[in-house]
Regions:
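Solvent-exposed, non-transmembrane regions of integral membrane proteins
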Residues: 1-259
Length: 259
């Protein structure tokens, strides 16, 4: 990219969290001391929200035309735009919720805080998210996997493929579903396509593909993906709060319309 890319690994925990808390503290001080100034007033205004959302939409469209190797989502302009949107949301909430009333501000708080949590956890979590691939052969213990760069890394669990089953359509013999039965630290679990197994807080195992033996009759091994997302539940909390706020807003509008 023309403006360079950000090394997200630098912001891995706890640096990302510390920077987020420090940013909120600075915004709070700025709002308290200069909240009536022209710059802060404009930055938290609805017009600024429209500008930021329009720029984000344009960047998303432009990002679709950029080659994958350019890593548009980690480019300085795009990340800077998302940080500006987070700062805008924070200032809007600080200004609106100075005198909080549940009946008046509850829906507003849920929507805006939900969006903020989902965005921040997505950005901070990018540095802590790991996707590893491992090849499991029947009856063999595996305790290492490979990242996207091909580097071998240790797994937190030892896994063994016990058996594998492929379900086919009787009409044309095409694969409908495939399943794998594993031992994860001697605990049995079942994997299927789009049906992962959770092995810890924010860590899931996905079944990706399989390979047949030379005769093409039996499965000799399968490929699994171990995804470590420690910020996943914070993101889910943000989404739930956003949905709750939307429902709350709709109900409030309906009640006010009947009065």
């Amino acid at each position: 990219m023309m403006f360079g890319n950000i090394n997200v690994e630098f912001f891995s925990f706890p640096i990302g969290l510390v920077l987020g808390v420090a940013g909120i503290a600075l915004l709070y001080v700025a709002h308290r001391e200069f909240g009536g100034g022209r710059f802060i007033t404009y930055f938290r205004s609805a017009r600024m929200a429209y500008v930021l959302l329009a720029l984000v939409a344009c960047c998303c469209v432009a990002g679709g035309a950029v080659p994958a190797f350019a890593r548009f989502t980690t480019s300085v302009p795009f990340v800077g735009l998302l940080v500006a949107l987070l700062a805008h949301l924070a200032l809007v909430m600080m200004h609106r919720l100075r005198k909080f009333s549940l009946g008046r501000d509850g829906a507003f708080a849920c929507v805006h805080l939900g969006i903020w949590l989902a965005m921040f956890s997505g950005m901070a979590g990018a540095a802590d998210t790991a996707r590893l691939h491992a090849l499991l052969a029947v009856g063999e213990d595996v305790s290492t996997a490979y990242d996207e760069n091909g580097c071998e890394l240790p797994l937190r669990h030892t896994m063994r493929l016990q058996r594998f089953a492929v379900e086919r359509n009787p009409a044309n013999n095409t694969v409908v579903q495939f399943r794998a039965w594993l031992l994860v630290d001697d605990e049995p679990c079942e994997l299927a396509v789009n049906s992962p197994h959770s092995v810890g807080l924010g860590e899931d195992i996905y079944l990706m593909s399989y390979h047949l033996n030379s005769s093409g009759t039996d499965v000799k091994d399968c490929v699994i993906q171990v995804v470590h997302e420690p910020w996943k539940y914070v993101t889910l909390l943000g989404i739930v709060m956003l949905l709750l706020g939307v429902v709350w807003t709709v109900k409030t509008i309906k009640v006010e319309g009947k009065v």
